[in-house]
Amino acid sequence: MPQSWSVEDIPDQSGRVAIVTGANSGLGLETSVALAGAGARVIMACRNPVKADAALQTVRSRIADADVSLMRLDLASLTSIRDFAHQFLSEHDQLDLLINNAGVMAIPLGRTEDGFEMQIGTNHLGHFALTGLLMNTLQETTGARVVNVASLAHRWTRGLDMDDLNFEDRGYNKWD
């Protein structure tokens, strides 16, 4: 097994469909570039349309023949997640790669439109709901994969209080 791995090692992705959440910057943008460069059809799932359009232009400028498109997705909204899944499923009959990358970190206390604490709602519940809504298509697509991107930030927390995920019974700490 090689000691290192790079974008050049990505096998041909022609004919494969990928969704990348949080594709407007950072790892999501670079993942979109890499997959498009390997021939995948990439759906960049982004919340902010202005940043998403700039990211789309970045991918197209770096990969001349990129098969890439934008779809709006706000993981802090179950309505947006349902709308995204419905639109995707109405336009595609396969999903080879679901890259759950979007996330927020160490933000002030806030709530999703459905009332969940923002970090739990966006980073965990949103991706869980999205994956669940796309699961049938993932299961029907031979060789499909789900990749959940995470960081080492969990090391800075005391752990999840499963009895108070919304910080209703204790003081909010953006690192918890």
Regions found by a protein language model. Name each.
Residues 2-176:
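Rossmann-fold NAD(P)H-dependent dehydrogenase/reductase core
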